[in-house]
Amino acid sequence: MSHGHSHGGGCSCESEPSDGPERGLEYGLFRKIDLDKLQCLNESREGSGRSVFRAWEERNDRTRFVESDDDEELLFNIPFTGNVKLKGIVLIGEDSDTHPAELRLFKNVPHMSFDDTGREADQTFSLNIDVNGNLEYPTKIARFSNVSHLSIHISKNFGAENTKIYYIGLRGEWTEAHRHEVTICNYEAAANPADHKVSQITPQTNFIS
């Protein structure tokens, strides 16, 4: 049962899809997260931010959660093991003011800090209190069609000093990253004038020898 808490600003569009066996498959993107490299800034207990990304069938496990430390904000840096087309997001919290009121998404900005959250988000949602995962917030799919890294900024809650989250579900499609594309990107990032000079004189050297 969803509650009628709403928050001004941003998009508050949500849907209530049917809860069948296929729902667990739809929310399987947690398997494509590089959990060892996932970061959650301002978590009160180290490593607890990772625990909220889990199987749909385990979404109501209240023993696993993340709680903010100094204030109400949380920032998740989520690297994927390939490229993701993100279609929707579900968030479960408590039926209290600790529930997040606003969620902001940033794509392909690794290692974000709170200082970086002043930039415009790729999409912002105003959240309603959801204790069972009944509400899905659909993303702008065209904007999130090629995501290798996702940052989730919980910017505010409904008035409590700290924020508490039990579950975050990500729905979408995953494709394996092509190794040769990564190699090309790495080369271009490391390119310098010396590299180009070497390539220019190499044919001449081969000709002389």
From Swiss-Prot:
GO terms for cellular component: cytoplasm; nucleus. GO terms for biological process: positive regulation of DNA-templated transcription; positive regulation of megakaryocyte differentiation. Keywords: Activator, Cytoplasm, Transcription, Transcription regulation. This is PITH domain-containing protein 1. It is found in: Cytoplasm. The gene is pithd1. PROSITE patterns: PITH (PS51532). Its main location: cytoplasm. PANTHER family: AD039 HT014 THIOREDOXIN FAMILY TRP26 (PTHR12175), PITH DOMAIN-CONTAINING PROTEIN 1 (PTHR12175:SF1). It comes from Xenopus laevis (African clawed frog). May play a role in promoting megakaryocyte differentiation by up-regulating RUNX1 expression. It comes from the Eukaryota. Coiled coil: none annotated. Belongs to the PITHD1 family. Residues 18-190 form the PITH domain.
